[in-house]
Each structure stands twice: as C-alpha cells, then as structure tokens.
From Swiss-Prot:
One MF term in the entry's GO annotations: ion channel inhibitor activity
A Pfam family: Conotoxin
The protein, known as: Conotoxin mr3d
Chief location category: secreted
Length: 67
C-alpha cells in the first residue's frame, strides 16, 4: 500500500491537477474575455450612431437609451 502512495505522490508532483485544463472554454473562467465578447451598444442593431442611443425601447438590451 505504501508503494501505491509513493507512486501517487510522484504522479501528482509530476502532473499537478492544476495543469489539467478542466473547463477552459467556459466564459465564467475568463471574465475579461467575456466582457469583450458582450455585444456593446455601438454594435447593437437598434443603436443610432448619430443620436448615440437606441431607436427603440431600452428593454431590448441596448444601452445608453434615449430617455
């Protein structure tokens, strides 16, 4: 049993669990990239670049809104 423990210890030292990518493609793991991937107001289909606000209501996810 002690040989198994020694083998396990050596394996964990050589290949730590932090080196294994678990869910690297999840946006929650990369908040900076998630913020860049969000649709900004300027790229929203209802955004009016002349008025710098949305043409329709704010409930559609476009900010800043025309009051």
């Amino acid at each position: 049993m002690s040989k198994l423990g020694i083998l396990l210890t050596i394996c964990l030292l050589l290949f730590p669990l932090t080196a294994v990518p678990l869910d690297g493609d999840q946006p929650a793991d990369r908040p900076a990239e998630r913020m860049q991937d969000d649709i900004s107001s300027e790229h929203h289909p209802f955004f009016d670049p002349v008025k710098r606000c949305c043409r329709l209501s704010c409930g559609l996810g476009c900010h800043p809104c025309c009051g």
